[in-house]
């Protein structure tokens, strides 16, 4: 069983959902980022979704764009992100790790080389945010060759064919987007049809569904679980804590610890 499958089985046995924070690797620096990720895991994160710094992200709202810029301004490359992943994996051999990134980052390294490097540093799954199902073939092939689970996004406007494609091609987990638009902790609206989407994904035997976009409060974690999802992903709200504490790293870690504990408590 993969780390994601093992974790979901463990959570199911305890009747808990998953809380999965997202941060950008190397934001604001390599060393601080490592401490931030350790704080997330040590305070109850069930898995990690991590981004590579990139100058032109499509789905990212202003908070995560700023995180990308901080890491890039600090001079961090994709290889630094891989080294950071390696460090995280050696400290936490069991935690499921997924990458959420844009296709250009993968192209820059070459498909095969990118997924090979992911495997070397202990990444479990990769979600390429801007690759539609129609163009998935090469990515899925390269991922599977290196034992990496491909993950796909189910948008709120998905038709039956898309839902089936997402369900059949995703491994590890399925990413259900709460609403159209870019990531944001402020925009906490979600599409009205999410419960139907969850039902349809399950009917096609999709892997466990994690809901993301606009998850900033414990109530939203509970709401996501009540729809039948396996958990919730919180990116902008997590990264905002980093952003507002750039001058006080200890305060940043303390606030992140409290945030993760509160969000995790909502899954029980």
Curated annotation (Swiss-Prot):
The alpha subunit is responsible for the aldol cleavage of indoleglycerol phosphate to indole and glyceraldehyde 3-phosphate. It is an enzyme of class 4 (lyase). Keywords: Amino-acid biosynthesis, Aromatic amino acid biosynthesis, Lyase, Tryptophan biosynthesis. The gene is trpA. InterPro entries: Aldolase_TIM, RibuloseP-bd_barrel, Trp_synthase_alpha_AS, Trp_synthase_suA. It comes from the Bacteria. Pathway: Amino-acid biosynthesis; L-tryptophan biosynthesis; L-tryptophan from chorismate: step 5/5. GO terms for cellular component: cytosol. Gene3D superfamilies: Aldolase class I. Its EC number is 4.2.1.20. Tetramer of two alpha and two beta chains. GO terms for molecular function: tryptophan synthase activity. This is Tryptophan synthase alpha chain. The lineage of its organism: Bacteria, Pseudomonadati, Pseudomonadota, Gammaproteobacteria, Pasteurellales. Pfam families: Trp_syntA.
